[in-house]
């Protein structure tokens, strides 16, 4: 796995078929999966994840797998999804075993910096469920501010 960039405790590598077993554990975790994959119905298969990896690589998506530096273990994925040329939406998914250890804050901060400094973005947006108070707090600590709220979602942004 080739490292693209790093932060204090995390190496950010391109998505790879090598991590499919780790991806499957994360996306098929019924207790935690609905927070980052809306409308989850059926368990994902290795073929589903292989297709996803291929699609990400073929489209040059800005998505990275996060690897814990000290152990080499998989933490989760973080991505910047297209909104426009200068605005992207950040998304993050962390395995249940690595939640609550500060990796979310570190990864969102690092990915926002990568987006603005390396990709030249002017604005990064995100959305989360209105009842995901822990995530909202983390995003605020990363410099994101709420700009819109609906019954189901909080929309936040970080502007250069």
Where do the language-model regions lie?
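A short, well-structured alpha-helix characteristic of acyl/acetyltransferase catalytic modules
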Residues: 1-46, 50
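A generic structured-segment signal
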Residues: 89, 104-116, 145-147, 155-157
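Hydrophobic adenine-recognition pocket in adenosine-nucleotide-binding enzymes
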Residues: 15, 94, 128
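Conserved acetyl-CoA-binding loop-helix of GNAT-fold acetyltransferases
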Residues: 94, 100-114, 136-141
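C-terminal "cap" of GNAT-fold acetyltransferases
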Residues: 122-133, 141-160
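Amphipathic alpha-helical recognition patches that constitute DNA-binding helices
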Residues: 22, 89, 93, 134
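Acetyl-CoA-dependent GNAT
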Residues: 39-91, 95-97, 150
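Conserved G/P- and acidic residue-centered "switch" motifs that form tight phosphate/ATP-binding loops
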Residues: 72, 102, 132
